[in-house]
């Protein structure tokens, strides 16, 4: 399978033989398992205070008084779950393991399947990405891209490739998050847009980090969640020639 390599002006800069990983069968089931496991394994432990609801002098009066055995303090029920300010019956435990296990072979197969999904224009469109009708997938650019340090240069490249509309979609879709996250440094929600896969992350990351919804990863470290956010394969991805060679070894 061959693909056209584009230069920084979007012009034809030759062809490249794609490795077999780009022809792997797309397995949404494996991709979903790998993504959900990655999300679960970075979940922060949480649980109730060991003494929550128990900091009271309430005592039960016992039997023989014609009244409930509920512990009371100053005539008010306390401590037990059915009282105001009492403990919870079965609170979350901080020692609980929320992680999920995935076999190594399945995890690697999920990455290969997610890589192959980036070659399917229908899957990319189904994820909601915007691009010109004449765009050919996968998108491969020359290694000159890795030398870019200015955001405007990246914007010019995306316009030449016919995929800048996806950046605009993500920018227009930015909304204020509902709930307590707005008070915890997560005020805005932003749609996911383009993923750049390169051999070196430093230069492209600096140039592209201010673009809405953009992520940068290396071919050696890109994972299933990078390629399939929300466990939906087919993310709009721009590869460099060197990154294609790196991902071939996955």
Curated annotation (Swiss-Prot):
Composition skew (Basic and acidic residues), residue ranges: 92-101
Keyword Kinase: no
GO MF terms held by the record: RNA binding; rRNA binding; structural constituent of ribosome
HAMAP family cross-referenced by the UniProt entry: Ribosomal_uL4_A
Name the record gives this protein: Large ribosomal subunit protein uL4
One GO location term (cellular component): cytosolic large ribosomal subunit
Swiss-Prot/TrEMBL keywords: Ribonucleoprotein, Ribosomal protein, RNA-binding, rRNA-binding
Assembly mode: Part of the 50S ribosomal subunit.
InterPro entries: Ribosomal_uL4, Ribosomal_uL4_dom_sf, Ribosomal_uL4_euk/arc_CS, Ribosomal_uL4_euk/arch, Ribosomall_uL4-arc
General function of this protein: One of the primary rRNA binding proteins, this protein initially binds near the 5'-end of the 23S rRNA. It is important during the early stages of 50S assembly. It makes multiple contacts with different domains of the 23S rRNA in the assembled 50S subunit and ribosome. Forms part of the polypeptide exit tunnel.
Biological processes per GO annotation: translation
Family label: Belongs to the universal ribosomal protein uL4 family.
Organism: Halobacterium salinarum (strain ATCC 700922 / JCM 11081 / NRC-1)
